[in-house]
Amino acid sequence: MDFIAILIGLGPLLGWGLFPTIASKFGGRPVNQIFGATVGTLIFAIVLALFKGIGLPGGMALVFSLISGAGWAFGQIITFKAFELVGSSRAMPITTAFQLLGASLWGVFALGNWPGITNKIIGFLALLVILIGARMTVWTETKQQEYSKNLRSAVILLLVGEIGYWIYSAAPQATDIGGFKAFLPQAIGMVIVAVIYALMNMSKGNAFKEKVSWQQTISGFFFAFAALTYLISAQPNMNGLATGFVLSQTSVVLATLTGIFFLNQKKTSKELMITIVGLVLILVAASITVFIK
């Protein structure tokens, strides 16, 4: 593993780590955030396709790629709604934990990962540690009824949103399409869902004409940059799938800390310390789930 590979592997740290913070900083409603983010991703995907000469896939590969992108957009809409309740610094560790659980369980029961009793025990213990780590990141010294209510609502929302993220990762596996080939149709699927969602919310304002929607395209560039660098990092001649995945998960640390310090989502010193320990537990346990043979 060389220096260039590590740099590329840390691309998702910056892209996915800053994406929720930038989206929250620009503000607006979830409809503005999802519309701008998906348009930004589509622009990035079109430029990449033109640069590399990648055309749209055909047949079921196209269908499943579109479904994949639609799943992500659904999950991200739900996540943006959770941001409104508890802030990105608290929502991101939870949704990351749920995504890790979803991906791991799918791998075990559908793809045959973690063969053998010992590996399964280690894997499920690691998943338990991930849940404990996520719980630590939302711990508060003062028990406020409104916060507890919002947190419960956010957790339920993020559980529902995990369905979309699972579709995003699982749908392309139904075909042999590569990540680069799927990137553009995934972005198209994202935009389709965002446009439908915007049309459904026209009574609350025209997201297509609101300035903040177009400002949010910048957040989409960050998401797309992360997705692209992850695809490159996961290639065998770079970091490989397992190491690339672990490096990409460091984004939850940046997303959480930038939410705390740049979005003024304040924590006490004790809460911050426990949050950091929780993040470390999530990263360590996530690494274990990937490297189980």
From Swiss-Prot:
Cellular localisation: Cell membrane
Origin superkingdom: Bacteria
MF annotations from Gene Ontology: carbohydrate transmembrane transporter activity
Cellular component aspect of the GO annotation: plasma membrane
Keyword terms, alphabetized: Cell membrane, Membrane, Sugar transport, Transmembrane, Transmembrane helix, Transport
Sequence intervals crossing the membrane: 5-24, 34-51, 58-80, 95-114, 121-138, 153-170, 177-199, 212-234, 241-263, 273-292
Function: Could be involved in the uptake of ribose.
Family (UniProt): Belongs to the GRP transporter (TC 2.A.7.5) family.
Record's protein name: Putative ribose uptake protein RbsU
Taxonomy of the source species: Bacteria, Bacillati, Bacillota, Bacilli, Bacillales
